[in-house]
Amino acid sequence: MSTMIQYVLYLAILVVLAIPLGAYIKNVMSGEKTFLSKVLTPCENLIYKVTRVDREEQMTWKKYAVSVMIFSGIGLVFLFLLQLLQGVLPGNPQHLSGVKWDLAFNTSASFITNTNWQAYSGESTLSYLTQALGLTVQNFVSAATGIAVLFALIRGFIKVKSSGLGSFWVDLTRIVVHILLPLNLVISLLLVGGGVIQNLKSAETVSLVEPIAVSAEGEILEDTVIDLDTETVTVDGEIVSNAQIVTEQFVPMGPAASQVAIKQTGTNGGGYMGVNSAHPLENPNAFTNLIEMISILLIPAALCFTFGSAVKNKMQGIAIFMAMFLCLVVALGCIAVTEQVGTSQLAQNGAVNMSMAEQAGGNMEGKETRFGIAASSTWAAFTTAASNGSVNSMHDSYTPLAGMVTMLLMQLGEVIFGGVGCGLYGMLAFAILAVFIAGLMVGRTPEFLGKKIEPYEMKWSVLVCLATPIAILVGSGLAAVVPSVMDSLHNGGAHGFSEMLYAYSSCGGNNGSAFAGFNANTVFLNVSLGLVMLFARFLPIIGTLAIAGSLAGKKKIATTAGTLSTTNGMFVFLLIVVVLLIGALSFFPALALGPLAEFFGSIA
């Protein structure tokens, strides 16, 4: 019962916070005053003055798209060079060398696309300068880019016989100054208060309370007797040769809290530490876990209410929100149940039944005992529903069915809330498809929010919806026939295939999480995954802006008795069916070879 209360509490807090934030974002989008305007508007105006941006400019969809591409391209080149040259730049107290070109390209593509796929361990690969000036900055502007494209699409629904969608530069500035900076300042302070590190100290080495012994293979030896004077390790009275005695531990330092805040709210996901929010210095306790977890879906959920308010049809925003929310609840339920029950092998040895006051049992492999099944399962559902990718547990250790659900959430196109901005404009593309299908069934010209949906919008909507499946399936298909990729798999068989499919699903869905057994730091994988991320990010952006430009040029159609309602339960059901059909039809064969084969093999 207490576990169920946790799930309900997490979801309730999300909804309660999302509604007022959605109203605030709507005011920012339309340039209306907010309670922070007196402080932030002068900063915004100063940026326009310095950069000579015309705040009244109305860009066509093509100019808006070109601006997005140029801005992202500059970010890609800057971050790439910053990584290559970090060895000779300041802000590097650990004297880390420059990053290899293929990993630098992969990381640059990852962060400018809001994916934050990490084929490296942050605390041992990147300097403080690279983390702060490179990654953290991209966390802000890549998130702002996604929201800006959504703003352009919303204006497409609002405007009548117009070619202007607003200015990308104005939208970008407003989003960063009025939304992301104040929100993340508050969250950063909460995280620091909860124990997340935030400093510029060099990494420290501390003495362990008691020494441990490690075998030649790097595994910790148990039940050992360690003699520090003779430097010998014995197990059951026998000396273990080649054993190494460890008496000190490396403790990373750095500006973690500020990066953790934006990695969550911006659905970026890239951790300051290699193990992301499973690290006790990045997510030390239940309080910080709650803050970080709710932050994942806060803006994506709020944008649904922003959309409804902006198009002057709040029920439309609620309908989109309910479609996403219902899918999330079902996915969370599947993950939670399968993780609590575990596998037949765990049940046989009694592991899932070991319930104590501190631990409720279940599949605890790869999970932190300070979080348990409920917080870990909720985070897994939230982070893969959004294009976030941060983790507080290792998804590679989840049961086959739970792993499949996390994979499917990404493969659906990251539209079950999805990334900030991109999740909602992806779902709106599915909504256009749903309206078109419904129009065919009743023999009427499809329309959505008073705008006719014609072949031009349909073609671009299909492209937006299929970009993710194409990127994932083509990428993973090519990787499956490259011999060197097999060396990156920690496991063979169905689970090994799942590791590879998850990697391409994560990058194609701009998510960034991974099955930890997959070694992605090779030239082929760094380049191929980087290209998948770029394709899956910018093709939908171009398609969305093309739809926005077309809709803005149309006139409004009066609602009649024969107009399909897009705010009732029937439309919500139809929208969910369309999303699931495209996902299921596209990925069922691949899922059958991976997690489904592993599941049925485990019960055979």
Residue ranges and their predicted role:
Residues F287-I318, F325-L326, S387-K459, F535-A536:
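Long hydrophobic segments that form regular secondary structure
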Residues P90-L135, Q198-I294, A347-C422, M486-F535, ...:
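P-loop potassium selectivity filter motif centered on the GYG triad
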Residues L9-G22, F71-L84, A148-R155, L185-G195, ...:
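Hydrophobic core segments of alpha-helical transmembrane domains in multi-pass membrane transport
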Residues A429-L433, A438-V442, K459-V485, L489-H490, ...:
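C-terminal catalytic subdomain
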Residues Y7, E56-I74, S167-L185, V311-L328, ...:
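Alpha-helical transmembrane segments and their helix-start/interface "positive-inside/aromatic belt" motifs
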Residues M1-N106, F151, I158-S162, G166, ...:
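N-terminal alpha-helical transmembrane segments of multi-pass membrane transport
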